[in-house]
Amino acid sequence: MEALTLLYMTCGDRGEAKAIARTLVNERLVACANILGKMTSIYQWQGALEEQEEVAVLLKTRRDLTDAVTERIKSLHSYDLPCVISLPIQGGYPDFLSWLQGEVG
């Protein structure tokens, strides 16, 4: 079985998150996207403390597609510097992981 990864991405609103997620799934770059509820992000940006409502998105894919997914997100995202973080999937329900592998690429 090929290595799998969970990508974490944030978006400014649910509409943008859905649009990006649909594109990534339709293009078979990710098998599944989970859009989570609103959250508050607090961070430094260009010398100022920022606080913004965002939504988080979890994306499941093969590890070898991480760079392609990241580049596609950058081309679709409204942020100058979108948050895209990769976390390795170390295990899970084998049937689900097999399905995931079959849906991408």
Report residues per predicted region.
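Positively charged, small/polar-rich N-terminal and surface patches that mediate targeting and assembly
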Residues: 1-105
